[in-house]
Regions:
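Compositionally biased terminal segments of proteins
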Residues: 1-97
Length: 97
């Protein structure tokens, strides 16, 4: 919810870091979240995150690249795509998208 309310680059980066480094990978993270998916705050939080990571060029992926201070266009585009695709995978697996 911090990403939605505060709009800080580090909030998006923290989410990306978790998606990238979660022990066991994204499928394990899905399994960990799944028992809580019907909780209202979980739904609200995931929807707010989904809004920020709606496309490759939305604020979530952009903030990830900004926080890492990636300037080279191809590297920046690749990082933004990776951030979007990981979040998209998680949200689709959780049936948020």
């Amino acid at each position: 919810m911090a990403l939605h309310d505060r709009l800080k680059e580090k909030d998006a980066w923290d989410i990306y870091f978790t998606l990238t480094n979660y022990p066991g990978g994204l499928d394990t993270l899905v399994v960990e979240i799944q028992p809580h998916i019907d909780h209202g705050l979980v739904q609200e939080g995931l929807r707010k995150i989904a809004d920020k990571f709606a496309t490759v060029t939305h604020v979530g992926p952009k903030f990830v690249a900004d926080f890492d201070d990636v300037q080279e266009p191809e590297e920046r585009a690749a990082l933004m795509r990776d951030a979007f695709e990981k979040m998209d995978y998680l949200l689709r697996a959780l049936k948020i998208r």
